[in-house]
Every structure is written in C-alpha cells, then in structure tokens.
C-alpha cells in the first residue's frame, strides 16, 4: 500500500516536471549570457525523455508517424549528405551539430515526448505563455542594454547595436497579439501598453525585414481572427507614420538612423550582384550537387570566386541573406526539395486546424505557430539567413498538439 502511494505521488510530479522543462526551454531560448543554464535545461530534458521512453517504449513511436516528423528526418539526412560533400567536413559537422543534432531534430524529438500525456488545451497554454515569457525576458534584457547605452550618451534608434534581437521579436510576436483575444478589458489595456513597448524595441532593431514580417503577421492575424476594427486602427496609424516620413523626405539622416531606414526604398544590395544575387550565381554553377553545409563553407566558396566577378558589391562574403538559398547552396537540389517538404508539412499541419475553422481564442496554438512560422521563415527568411534550429520549436509543439 505504501509503495503504491509513493509511486502515485511520483507520477503526479511527472507532468509538472515535464511542463516546467519545456516552458523553461522556450522562455530562456533567446536570452544571451546564460548558455550554461540553457544547456542544463536541455540535459535535463534529454535525461527525462530517455527515462520515460525506457519505461514505456512502445507508446512513443506513434507520436512520430506523420509528415511533420518525416520532413524533419528527411532534411536532417540530406544535411548529412551535405557534410559528406563539404570541402571542410569538420566545420560542416560542427554546424550540423549546432543546428540539427542539438537543434531542430532534438527539439522535435524532446517536446512531444515530454508533453505526451498532456491535452491539446494544456499544450496550447504552454505555447502561449512560454512565448510571452520569452518575449518579456528578451525585452527586459534588451532594456538593460538601452540603459547602458543611454548612460554612455547613445540614444535609441541611431545604431544597429540592437539589431540582434529582431529574430526573437519576429518569432514570438504572434503570442503578443493573442493577448488581445482575452475578453477582460483590463487585459486589453495591458495589451496596448505592451504593444507600445514592443513597438519601441522592434523599431530599435532598424531591421526592415523584421518590420515587414511583423506587419504581414499582424495583418494575417487580424484577418484570420476577424479583428476588423484593429485593421482600421492599424491602417490609420500606418498612414500617419507614412505622412510623417514623407514630410521629412528632404532631410538626409545618417544611414544608421531610424528615419533613414523608414525612408529607404532600395534593397540594401540584396539582389543584382548583392548578397542574394551572388548566392544565386553560385547556386547556378552547381545547382544539383551543392557545395557543403555551413557558413564557413559558403564564405570560403564566395571569397574564392569573387575575383572572377569584379561587379559583385561585396568583396568578402557576408552570407546569402536568404534561408532557402543557403540550404540550396549547401545541399543542392535535394536540400531545396527537403526544405520545401518541411515547409509544406508545417503549413499543412497548421492550416488543417487554422484555415478550415478559425477558433477565436488566445489559446489557438496552431494559428500562433503558423504565424510564427510565416513571419520568421517565410517573410524574414526571405531577407535574412535565419536560424534553422528554431523550426524545431514549431515542429515539436505541432507533434505535441497531435497527442490527444
């Protein structure tokens, strides 16, 4: 009797422990300077997952019998191929280890295993509140840097010093929007305050790609949740901002100032002979096989070939600035196909629950993950080479949402 009671008490703590690990993992994911603690969380997640799988090995394989996991597995295998063809296999494997083995493949495995016994409603709440906490902590950490800058006489919106936070601002943005869907007026007031704070930080990145991603995600969110009044208010605000920018058109601000970025209409040397244009030229020279995985491989090939193309804007590589081009360059046509397969699987999984019947609720996790994916990988990934590892957070939660 006593043994049975102790066993039951241990089982009661298991879901709390599992949920806490997943929550902490997402909440701290974008924080800098706490690498050892983030590694500790991952280690605890791995140990817990291994223990639970060993206790009931036959109950876990069904979690991964679907196109989302298959697409993750295919991309992982294709990137193994890209290591084998790499001129620097050591660097390619290091990149593979960071982004795949310790990145999206690991996250895709761990999250659904740890949340296996949770309902869709519980998983949806973890998604929302872990994203919100992560966004809050990221903004809090960045505010400290702004204070330090101010003490040095550096004002906001005049340098690219805060550009590094744009990834987290785009990836986590849909969670902020979902606060509006809570019915209490007090919470809606909190939403307005938090939105003003968010606007400060996103403008401070001086990243037009991030701005565009946030704009598109915001419009999609409002349409899918039928928030027509917010669309009207947003359109008015954009018109006012646009008018203010136009009135300042004759001013010639510093290229690292906010006003300059708002007025800028060119592509920042992305296309013809720029970052993406040159990446496309290199891909055309070897579209089937690819060159090998890793930023160092790309830089090496680019820097070697730039002497043959005197019209290229950048004499040293600064990357392809496009996620799809990066994978295509790395693994050839198979890499492109596998990435498209993964993107398609995610869109299909989220759209099956999102576009068919939109549930106007702050806990609509499928819609939140869909918008996070679109903003970060489809829109921002078209202007920057975004971190592929984070896609494992999306796929991991999507698999967890299939449990029940």
Curated annotation (Swiss-Prot):
One of its GO terms (biological process) is lipopolysaccharide core region biosynthetic process. It is an enzyme of class 2 (transferase). Its EC number is 2.4.99.26. Keywords: Cell inner membrane, Cell membrane, Glycosyltransferase, Lipopolysaccharide biosynthesis, Membrane, Transferase, Transmembrane, Transmembrane helix. It is a multi-pass membrane protein. Its main location: membrane. The keyword Repeat does not apply. It catalyses: a lipid-linked O antigen + a lipid A-core oligosaccharide = a lipopolysaccharide + a polyisoprenyl diphosphate. One of its GO terms (cellular component) is plasma membrane. Pathway: Bacterial outer membrane biogenesis; lipopolysaccharide biosynthesis. It holds the Pfam family Wzy_C. It is found in: Cell inner membrane. The keyword Ligase does not apply. Disruption phenotype: Loss of the gene reverses a known growth defect in a Salmonella mutant that otherwise accumulates O-unit intermediates. GO terms for molecular function: glycosyltransferase activity. InterPro entries: O-antigen_ligase-rel_domated, WaaL-like. Belongs to the O-antigen ligase family. Transferase involved in the biosynthesis of the lipopolysaccharide (LPS). Catalyzes the transfer of a polymerized O-antigen molecule from its polyprenyl diphosphate membrane anchor to a terminal sugar of the lipid A-core oligosaccharide, finalizing the biosynthesis of the lipopolysaccharide. May also be involved in a feedback mechanism to regulate O-unit synthesis, based on the availability of O units on the periplasmic face of the membrane. This is O-antigen ligase. It comes from Salmonella typhimurium (strain LT2 / SGSC1412 / ATCC 700720).
